[in-house]
Swiss-Prot record:
The lineage of its organism: Eukaryota, Viridiplantae, Streptophyta, Coleochaetophyceae, Coleochaetales. SUPFAM superfamilies: HydB/Nqo4-like. This is NAD(P)H-quinone oxidoreductase subunit H, chloroplastic. InterPro entries: NADH_Q_OxRdtase_suD, NADH_UbQ_OxRdtase_49kDa_CS, NDH1_su_D/H, NiFe-Hase_large. Its EC number is 7.1.1.-. HAMAP family: NDH1_NuoD. Its main location: plastid. NDH is composed of at least 16 different subunits, 5 of which are encoded in the nucleus. It is a peripheral membrane protein. It comes from Chaetosphaeridium globosum.
Amino acid sequence: MLTKKTDPMIVSMGPHHPSMHGVLRLVVSLDGENVIDCDPVLGYLHRGMEKIAENRSIVQYLPYVTRWDYLATMFTEAITVNAPEKLANIQVPKRASYIRVIMLELSRIASHLLWLGPFMADIGAQTPFFYIFREREMVYDLFESATGMRMMHNYFRIGGVAVDLPYGWLDKCLDFCDYFLPKIAEYENLITNNPIFRKRVEGIGIISREDAINWGLSGAMLRGSGVQWDLRKVDHYECYDELDWSIQWQSDGDCLARYLVRMGEMRESIKIIQQALKAIPGGPYENLEARRLNEGPKSEWNDFEYQFISKKSSPTFKLPKNEHYVRVEAPKGELGIYLIGDDTVFPWRCKIRPPGFVNLQILPQLVKGMKLADIMTILGSIDIIMGEVDR
């Protein structure tokens, strides 16, 4: 029987494909249903965020940073204020640190929920998509009552947070934690042992421990491959050391392992929030406020311009002639900023290290030899947001 060798078919997936999680284009070479090669095309959402940073003071730049990973905006704000804090050695009051941790973990839950829904929809399960939006709305309600915004919160400031938590907010947050824990169990009962789900994710997109380290992966991509690496434990930032929680990890390295890591992380986040809510101390919520309270009623911080004109010290805050790399454990991995100060209010250089951009590099290697339908499963398990990939 004669067999005719056919040329590979080139298919362009995206940039407006419903499963692309933003404007990503994949140029895929196919032999029948099998993927021979995959070439990601980036840059559709490039806005020059690093260059904008060089022409703005840190406080002016804060509203921009929430547009990188617009589903976990607290983390982009945290890293933007942490960098100048470390650079100029600014102390953050204890209360502010606890408020930050609560906000960061709520943001992590919201991000993981909005990963889970579309990931399941990509695989073909529509129902969880509606479940996760129900719980995510509650997180956004908490954000709205504390910061005034549901997304793009603009809440973090150099030396603390913009405003203190409103009256009754801590109780509302505790109620949410009590409500949400059983919901995670409900998701797991619904999804984890579903035979169709298992067939779509088990043994798909396997990353070995060595590959995960060599490619510089971070977050669930790294911990799903058996590496117990979480920057909250490694870098000891904010007040995570004072709370009792454990790193979530799996050793299989496939899409199922990454799913299990993120489900476990939501549980740990609730645990962290509950402890922080119970242990949160009193006192000032921001560094300038702390100085004002320390110096009493005759302090210059009590003057009209410091009280009412946007807390004057922030807009004219000069970055020392120094350089520093600061990172946080964002929901998608290691989010870092390399900041170089030049003794002016503007940074001389602000290099962003987004987790999505680095994690996406391994995609062509993972999809080679797989079926076309597996591309969506693998891409979904990486969890990218094009806002931070393209910046």
